[in-house]
Amino acid sequence: MARLQFQLKVDGLEDESLVVRGFEGQESLSDSVWRCEPCYGFRYQVDLASALSNLTAEQFVDQTAHLTILRDGQVVQQINGIVRQLSKGDTGHRHTFYSLTLVPALERLSLRSNSRIFQQQSVPEIISILLQEMGIEDYAFALKRECAQREFCVQYRETDLQFLHRIAAEEGLVYSHLHEAQKHTLLFTDSSDSQPKLAKPVPYNALAGGEINLPYVVDLQFKTTAQVSHTELKDYSFKKPAYGFTQRTQGKDIAYQQPNYEHFDAPGRYKDDANGKAFSQIRLEYLRRDALLADAKSDEPLLLAGVRFDLQDHLDHAMNRDWLVVQANHQGTQPQALQEEGGSGATTYSNQLKLIPAHITWRARPCAKPQVDGPMIATVVGPQGEEIYCDNFGRVKVHFPWDRYSSSNEKSSCWVRVAQEWAGSQYGSMAIPRVGHEVIVSFLNGDPDQPIITGRTYHATNTAPYALPDHKTKTVLRTETHQGQGYNELSFEDQAGSEQILLHAQKDWDALIEHDHTEVIRHDQHLTVDNDRFTRIQRNQHLTVEGEVRSKIALDSSHEVGASLQHKVGQRIAVEAGKEISLKSGAKIVVEAGAELTLKAGGSFVKVDAGGVHLVGPAINLNAGGSAGSGSAYGGQLAAAPRMLAQAKPVAELVQPDIAASMQSGAARVIDVASLPTMMPSSANNTANDEPVAEEKTPERILKSDLLKPSDELEKLAKRQASAYRQGNHSDEVKLLQEALIKLGFDLGKAGADGDFGSKTKTAIEQFQKSYQPSHQTHPSYSIGAVDGIVGKGTLLALDEALMDGWVYENNIYQIWPLGKTSEKYESAGRGPGVISTGNGDYGGASYGCYQMSSNLGVVQKYIQSSKFKEFFSGLNPATKEFNVVWQDIASRYPQEFREEQHQFIKRTHYDIQIGHLRGKGLLFEHNRAAVHDLIWSTSVQFGGRTNLIFNALNGQNMESMTDKDIIILVQDYKLVNTERLFKSSPSWWSDLKKRAVSEKKALLELEIDGLEVDIK
């Protein structure tokens, strides 16, 4: 008969201080409930006795404790945790009784509540941040599926643990704990295959009354329950408004039940097919997690939650298989530990188990997402100096008042859509909220991850255009001149007797009327033109004036009539000229008067009337010589034509946006996890008119290679009618792109063409973008574009052309990595040499260029002194508007030279100095590859060329036995732990710096896996 013994050790107490009377506890995969208390992986109640009656809570609570189970003097199980609660009971003859609650360190996260925003981070990255903030370093991930980065993930009025549970369950992650002598490791998995397994099978004791000397399982009861047979999720994305986003997953092993138990839900909380497929599968696995479930009893203490084991010796051979423990309840009694209880009874241990077949994946219970009770106020933000900051969809960035971590800049939020008064296909209204505006933000379905701006408000500093309530009858639409002074305005005054419509254009007012324009003015019209006025009428002008016409022309007046000029006057015409009146006709001039005609000049006159012709003058000369007087010739000026509108085309003639051509309908129905049917456009099943489909002409395809040409989705991308492919995508099209890369000579590793766009695929795309020179034989006019690892139209056409040309990549053994690329990614997000950061909250002040050279620390000043562009900055100081304008102007005019000069300056003043500094301390890195050199570069940029950080992180290590991976982990973890000591920044920047340390560690480890050489120049 095996002899059992239980021991408990609390850090800081003598081993002999406590004896275990008994314990009860529960372990579970992820969270559960035990005795109406939450159980976060495990929870034990341990009853103790001690000869010491003066033990205090300070000696127990929040301390690490270890419960050990021994069999025949050998340790068979250890439960490591922290003491959450201590109860002190009665004192007997020799002992005082205590009871404590043992829980995982993870439970500490339940005591912190927060609201904050995570951007462009995956769930494992977010979880690691939560754990590290609490000082939990013993955790690990064993995941089969790569979790996509989340554009915008909000922890909203939740404890850290509630948030962790929620996002982990969304991605299908469950956790368990691996116990050791001095610690317990939190293990996250997404597949039963990743759970630890006992090395030896556990026997089943089927004989009542029989004895067995080894731990065993008894009372196995296997239950089969009808559950949901399939799931269907549906969602929506404004980027593909007509696309179905439907994902359907069919359950397996359901022959025993009806197949029509459907679980439908919308929205499904995803925006692409790859995530939708995974989420649908995860939802089904959760709903069916107890469809095949077994209950059993055991005295094997190794059977903890999350452990797989093989069962043997069961009379039903179907039960002799591998099982996964999803929940275990443990009991142990040790009555002989106390002398005053007479030592009656033996030490016992037993447990009750909840098991599932190990081929089934257990999913955690989904947690309700916190609902935003209603709209909230936010402020529109953007980069320093920007008044209007938006993307091609008119989305803006905002800062919420509760956000304690961001710096109220373009990194404060995701792009947030803005509701407009009217929105159609290239018609409607558009008013972009500007930086500094206060907006009302609502949330789709109450989801804090999906903000949308639904209104705008004034406040104490952003006031209305007119003072209120003095102008309460005025309705106003006033804009403000961008990067200048002034405004445009349309306002309506509704005060009785003072009604008015006011239109103010700060510069130009252009109008295009496609047909008639009718105006009726019941009173006066006044028109003042301060400069010139031009009018052009293509046909006729009709003018009727019921009263007078008065004109005053300060200079000349010219009239040119192509045909006849006719005036009819009812009474008289009076023309007066200060000097001369000239009349000239090419043929004749006829002057006719009904009664009298008079010509008068110089005291003489000729008068013609009914009485005859009268000539009066000092002398009358007939054929007496002399000459006729002459008048001035016509000198009128041609009228200048008015200028035309800059854009006179009607809206109906505008080119429709690409998104309209990419609209799809229908549903992607997933039959099993390995296949996804190809989505067909709605036009594939319905013709747009009454013409037979057979008569429609098939347009010529752009793609030409046999590999890529058959894909309709890739053809759409070639026409810029579909989105680009990037890391995190999963589809048949990605698989085709991977096959193309392999055919062109790129190595994608063991996974090969698996349809998952991972880091290997991204690296291969970047290598292709760098190395391929377009021949333009297949596609005459295109550009590959930036080296970004994204397959857009240009890269797709290049791949197609390379396949047609038979091009092969010939440098696939040791690829060359550009030194400093990782640093540039994290310093300036790869935005180029002209980028400027404001430095709000940063000890370094405003920062410049690819590597964000500091102004407060004098780095950018040193760079200017050595720059060939030095004269451009003469008399200018960094962090001023004038300096910034010159900096960005140089970047736009000389982008390559400016970038290379910055690179060489940082190499000379930071990287080379740090390499020499480390060499002087005996640390040599000549044989390390790109990942380590990028680590050194990035650290020197962030902490200075003479920093001791790398030396301190590696001090005492055996460098000869260390791998590149070891070096990266030690240095980045050192940064994470010492952030607040190393940086004189604001708390919000500390948070960003910690996030960077975690993210950069991941990026460098991925680079280390690629094994690339580095170009040190």
Swiss-Prot record:
<dbReference type="Pfam" id="PF04717">
    <property type="entry name" value="Phage_base_V"/>
</dbReference>
<keyword id="KW-0964">Secreted</keyword>
<dbReference type="Pfam" id="PF05954">
    <property type="entry name" value="Phage_GPD"/>
</dbReference>
<feature type="active site">
    <location>
        <position position="842"/>
    </location>
</feature>
<dbReference type="InterPro" id="IPR006531">
    <property type="entry name" value="Gp5/Vgr_OB"/>
</dbReference>
<dbReference type="InterPro" id="IPR017847">
    <property type="entry name" value="T6SS_RhsGE_Vgr_subset"/>
</dbReference>
<comment type="similarity">
    <text>Belongs to the VgrG protein family.</text>
</comment>
<dbReference type="InterPro" id="IPR006533">
    <property type="entry name" value="T6SS_Vgr_RhsGE"/>
</dbReference>
<dbReference type="Pfam" id="PF01471">
    <property type="entry name" value="PG_binding_1"/>
</dbReference>
<dbReference type="GO" id="GO:0016787">
    <property type="term" value="F:hydrolase activity"/>
</dbReference>
<dbReference type="Pfam" id="PF21277">
    <property type="entry name" value="T6SS_VgrG3-like_C"/>
</dbReference>
<dbReference type="InterPro" id="IPR002477">
    <property type="entry name" value="Peptidoglycan-bd-like"/>
</dbReference>
<comment type="function">
    <text>Part of the type VI secretion system specialized secretion system, which delivers several virulence factors in both prokaryotic and eukaryotic cells during infection. Forms the spike at the tip of the elongating tube formed by haemolysin co-regulated protein Hcp. Allows the delivery of the TseL antibacterial toxin to target cells where it exerts its toxicity. Additionally, acts directly as an effector and targets the cell wall peptidoglycan layer of prey cells for degradation via its C-terminus. Toxicity is counteracted by a cognate immunity protein TsiV3.</text>
</comment>
<keyword id="KW-0378">Hydrolase</keyword>
<dbReference type="InterPro" id="IPR036366">
    <property type="entry name" value="PGBDSf"/>
</dbReference>
<dbReference type="InterPro" id="IPR050708">
    <property type="entry name" value="T6SS_VgrG/RHS"/>
</dbReference>
<protein>
    <recommendedName>
        <fullName>Type VI secretion system spike protein VgrG3</fullName>
        <ecNumber>3.2.1.-</ecNumber>
    </recommendedName>
</protein>
<dbReference type="Pfam" id="PF22178">
    <property type="entry name" value="Gp5_trimer_C"/>
</dbReference>
<dbReference type="InterPro" id="IPR049073">
    <property type="entry name" value="T6SS_VgrG3-like_C"/>
</dbReference>
<comment type="subunit">
    <text>Interacts with TsiV3. Interacts with TseL.</text>
</comment>
<dbReference type="InterPro" id="IPR037026">
    <property type="entry name" value="Vgr_OB-fold_dom_sf"/>
</dbReference>
<dbReference type="GO" id="GO:0005576">
    <property type="term" value="C:extracellular region"/>
</dbReference>
<dbReference type="InterPro" id="IPR036365">
    <property type="entry name" value="PGBD-like_sf"/>
</dbReference>
<dbReference type="InterPro" id="IPR054030">
    <property type="entry name" value="Gp5_Vgr_C"/>
</dbReference>
